[in-house]
Structure formats: structure tokens, C-alpha cells
């Protein structure tokens, strides 16, 4: 990479850090190309991205962002997993780490908050934003459904009684 390419990459990475809801930093030493491609595709399907960057360039890109506090995590062969949804990157990274012992999560950030390895794992256990929205809609619509059932119940009971009398009249 020449200087202009490095400058452009740092600018792009800085923008990615600014837009991301969460960032996960991990060591990937020893992973095969197939495993890395698997991680990238899983992260992409979930709405996140994985980027391998030189530590020096990543540290420069972190300057002036909310995630600047994680600069110390960039030692050795590190990769960056990030997503706009704060739950996506940690969830995919933790799931991938369960099956690949050479993938070691170092920590991360969510906005201005630095995350330890345990914090990343606990964040991964939370439901995604879409799952939370679905639960909220379910909680709101359930009482309305029950009210409709209660209001319609007497009419249904009357109809069943009339139906029973009609059946009795036919058999008698």
C-alpha cells in the first residue's frame, strides 16, 4: 500500500468506526482462509463486517472517534468486526469463537464505552434490535387481542346456545 492508499483506507476505517454501533477486536492467528471467509460471510449475512487492518493504521483511524479507548487492544494479528446494530458484531464473533479456538476475542467498544471480553460475551447474549421490536409489538398487541376475545365471547356463547337448541329441535 502506498501513502495515498493508506490515507484513503484510514479515512474509510475512521468512518466505519464512527458509524458502527459496536466494534469487536479479536486475534485471528492460525485461522485458515476458509474459516476467515466463513466468518466474513456470517458477519455479512447478519449485517456486520470484518476487516483486517494493520494495527498502526487502525490506531490512527480510531483517533477522534468514540471508540478511541480501545486503541490498546491492537497488538499482534488483530481483526475488527463491526456493525451498526450494537448486538450483531458481538453475537456473530462470540458464536464463531465458540467453534474456533484460534479466534480469540480481545474486547471491543459500544459507542464511547470500552468492552472487556466478558462484556462482549454478555452483549452477545442479548436479543437483537429487531427481536426486541418484535417482542414489544407482541406485548402491545396481546392485550388488544384479549379484549377483542372477551367482547366477542358473549355473542359466541349466545350463538352456541341457539345452535344447541336448533340441534335439539331437529332430533326431537
From Swiss-Prot:
This is Large ribosomal subunit protein uL10. The lineage of its organism: Bacteria, Pseudomonadati, Pseudomonadota, Alphaproteobacteria, Hyphomicrobiales. It comes from Bartonella quintana (strain Toulouse) (Rochalimaea quintana). Belongs to the universal ribosomal protein uL10 family. One of its GO terms (biological process) is translation. InterPro entries: Ribosomal_uL10, Ribosomal_uL10-like_sf, Ribosomal_uL10_bac, Ribosomal_uL10_bac_type, Ribosomal_uL10_CS_bac. Keywords: Ribonucleoprotein, Ribosomal protein, RNA-binding, rRNA-binding. Part of the ribosomal stalk of the 50S ribosomal subunit. The N-terminus interacts with L11 and the large rRNA to form the base of the stalk. The C-terminus forms an elongated spine to which L12 dimers bind in a sequential fashion forming a multimeric L10(L12)X complex. The gene is rplJ. Forms part of the ribosomal stalk, playing a central role in the interaction of the ribosome with GTP-bound translation factors. SUPFAM superfamilies: Ribosomal protein L10-like. GO terms for cellular component: large ribosomal subunit.
Amino acid at each position: 500500500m502506498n501513502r495515498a492508499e493508506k490515507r484513503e483506507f484510514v479515512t474509510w476505517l475512521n468512518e466505519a468506526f464512527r458509524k458502527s454501533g459496536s466494534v469487536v477486536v479479536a486475534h485471528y492467528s492460525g485461522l485458515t482462509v476458509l474459516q476467515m471467509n466463513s466468518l466474513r460471510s456470517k458477519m455479512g449475512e447478519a449485517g456486520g463486517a470484518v476487516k483486517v487492518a494493520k494495527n498502526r493504521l487502525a490506531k490512527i483511524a480510531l483517533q477522534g472517534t468514540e471508540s478511541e479507548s480501545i486503541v490498546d487492544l491492537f497488538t499482534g494479528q488483530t481483526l475488527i468486526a463491526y456493525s451498526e446494530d450494537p448486538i450483531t458484531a458481538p453475537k456473530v464473533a462470540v458464536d464463531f469463537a465458540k467453534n474456533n479456538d484460534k479466534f480469540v476475542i480481545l474486547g471491543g467498544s459500544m459507542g464511547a464505552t470500552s468492552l472487556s471480553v466478558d462484556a462482549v460475551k454478555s452483549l452477545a447474549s442479548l436479543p437483537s434490535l429487531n427481536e426486541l421490536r418484535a417482542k414489544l409489538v407482541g406485548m402491545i398487541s396481546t392485550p388488544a387481542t384479549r379484549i377483542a376475545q372477551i367482547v366477542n365471547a358473549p355473542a359466541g356463547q349466545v350463538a352456541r346456545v341457539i345452535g344447541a337448541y336448533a340441534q335439539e329441535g331437529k332430533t326431537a
